[in-house]
Amino acid sequence: MDHQPGEVWLADLGLAAKTRPVIIVSRRDPNAPGALVLYVPLTTQDRQSRYEVSLPRLGFLDRDSVANVQGLGSIPIARLERKLGRIPNQIMSKVQSALAWALDLETPSN
């Protein structure tokens, strides 16, 4: 199943989380062992947190949503059910920045 960073997929996240939209955040690497994909889940519960990035109602999302980077996870590629669409590059940059901040990957400024 072909997937790219910035795409939104409907994914089976297991019994507790059920099926929900996720943003793919890992690179497409056909040589990677394990066939896993990293994702950030979307939710409609906006807590106004630095761990969340707001998404407007896009054509493939029926409600305003937020990407919750604290929910970063991995699933087998086989659990991606169908591609819904792609978020704009400017929003993906905000998701990547929020992930870098949450994981303390920001480089100190000199």
Where are these predicted regions, by residue range?
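C-terminal terminal-subdomain/extension
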Residues: 60-110
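Compact nucleic-acid interaction/catalytic patches
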Residues: 17-57
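Short, well-ordered loop/turn sites that connect or cap secondary structure elements
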Residues: 2-3
